[in-house]
């Protein structure tokens, strides 16, 4: 059975095709992604209207390329991200998916974007057991308890202000490094040393005992970087950009990995899964590996291409649901910018 997945929650237009065997095994047949990142760069972040228009323009070509890559004329089912995400962007992808499903006469499944980031774990090795997922991107920073792929997830913690990826972009803009901030800061950090003392949000003893035990905050860190730059300007000194990037990156990775490992210990999960665009960050991966090894926790990190938004992850979560006998969502299925993590599949109306 062939399942085609469409992802359009932010600035990537992704179409992926997965072949689902009767025993539940999944094989990637196509993975095509078009990004509108360059169009957003001049604005220093994603502009929703530009993202929506870019999806409209890219969808026909991306769809054609995916079908050609898989060597098929049509799939047996179509799935799309219906939330969470940007309203216009979600609407483009979901509408396209439903139109293709209707034209091909195949069922439509409306799935959760965050569930997709978790589902790619089943494509990388053994089936994901009870675990904690740390999903980190420009729009999300969440700790989720996962019983299994395709099942309702439980939010353990989230950011109370900026997402980690958003903090990277803002700091990059502050330092004049451009957009997106993640790759350039990661590169410069490798050339510097984390010698600048920067705050770790919600990491004090009282925070770790209270309701913010698993929550994050990056606004204070961002402000501290800004003050460091302002102080250098006042004093006429040179900002050591490489050291500042290394210090900022260390602070982010420190908090993310410490809280992720603690969440595993609190829930009894023996696996930590990293997902989202920031999961491609070299320091986050290295520190997560070190701390997981010390704590006796298995770390799973998707290959770089599957960390960022893509259609394969949407096809993967739909494939798991189909294998378990889930009913299609139907063409009346709507989108929800704030879709809860407890909803892996939007039910038929």
From Swiss-Prot:
Binding site for Fe cation: 113, 117, 309
Lineage: Bacteria, Bacillati, Actinomycetota, Actinomycetes, Mycobacteriales
Species per Swiss-Prot/TrEMBL record: Corynebacterium aurimucosum (strain ATCC 700975 / DSM 44827 / CIP 107346 / CN-1) (Corynebacterium nigricans)
Stated role: Required for the formation of a threonylcarbamoyl group on adenosine at position 37 (t(6)A37) in tRNAs that read codons beginning with adenine. Is involved in the transfer of the threonylcarbamoyl moiety of threonylcarbamoyl-AMP (TC-AMP) to the N6 group of A37, together with TsaE and TsaB. TsaD likely plays a direct catalytic role in this reaction.
Main location: cytoplasm
Listed name of the protein: tRNA N6-adenosine threonylcarbamoyltransferase
Cellular localization per UniProt: Cytoplasm
GO (cellular component) term, any one: cytoplasm
UniProt remark on cofactor binding: Binds 1 Fe(2+) ion per subunit.
Required cofactor(s): Fe(2+)
CDD domains found in the cross-reference section: ASKHA_NBD_TsaD_bac
PANTHER family: TRNA N6-ADENOSINE THREONYLCARBAMOYLTRANSFERASE, TRNA N6-ADENOSINE THREONYLCARBAMOYLTRANSFERASE, MITOCHONDRIAL
Catalytic activity: L-threonylcarbamoyladenylate + adenosine(37) in tRNA = N(6)-L-threonylcarbamoyladenosine(37) in tRNA + AMP + H(+)
GO biological process annotation, one example: tRNA threonylcarbamoyladenosine modification
Pfam families recorded: TsaD
Family statement: Belongs to the KAE1 / TsaD family.
EC number(s) from the headed UniProt entry: 2.3.1.234
Residues annotated for substrate binding in this entry: 135-139, 169, 182, 186, 281
């Amino acid at each position: 059975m062939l399942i085609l997945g469409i992802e359009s929650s932010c600035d990537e237009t992704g179409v992926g095709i997965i072949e689902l065997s009767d025993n539940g095994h999944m094989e990637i047949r196509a993975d095509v992604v078009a990004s509108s990142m360059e169009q957003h760069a001049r604005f220093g972040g994603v502009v929703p209207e530009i993202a929506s228009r870019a999806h409209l323009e890219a969808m026909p070509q991306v769809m054609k390329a995916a079908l050609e890559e898989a060597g098929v004329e049509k799939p047996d089912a179509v799935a799309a991200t219906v939330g969470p995400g940007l309203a216009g962007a979600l609407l483009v992808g979901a509408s396209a998916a439903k139109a293709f499903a209707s034209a091909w006469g195949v069922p439509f499944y409306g799935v959760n974007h965050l569930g997709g980031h978790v589902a790619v774990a089943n494509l990388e090795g053994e089936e994901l057991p009870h675990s904690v997922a740390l999903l980190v991107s420009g729009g999300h920073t969440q700790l989720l308890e996962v019983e299994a792929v395709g099942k309702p997830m439980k939010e353990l913690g989230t950011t109370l202000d900026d997402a980690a990826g958003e903090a990277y972009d803002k700091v990059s803009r502050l330092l004049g490094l451009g957009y997106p901030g993640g790759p350039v800061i990661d590169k410069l950090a490798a050339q510097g040393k984390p010698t600048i003392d920067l705050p770790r949000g919600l990491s004090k003893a009282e925070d770790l005992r209270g309701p913010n035990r698993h929550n994050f905050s990056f606004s204070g860190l961002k402000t501290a970087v800004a003050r460091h730059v302002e102080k250098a300007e006042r004093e006429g000194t040179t900002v050591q950009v490489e050291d500042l990037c290394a210090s900022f990156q260390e602070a982010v990775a420190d908090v993310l990995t410490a809280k992720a490992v603690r969440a595993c210990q609190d829930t009894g999960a023996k696996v930590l899964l990293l997902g989202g665009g920031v999961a491609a960050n070299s320091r986050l991966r290295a520190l997560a590996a070190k701390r997981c090894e010390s704590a006796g926790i298995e770390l799973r990190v998707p290959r770089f291409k599957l960390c960022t938004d893509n259609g394969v992850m949407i096809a993967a979560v739909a494939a798991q649901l189909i294998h378990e006998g889930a009913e299609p969502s139907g063409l009346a299925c709507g989108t929800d910018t704030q879709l809860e993590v407890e909803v892996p599949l939007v039910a038929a109306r």
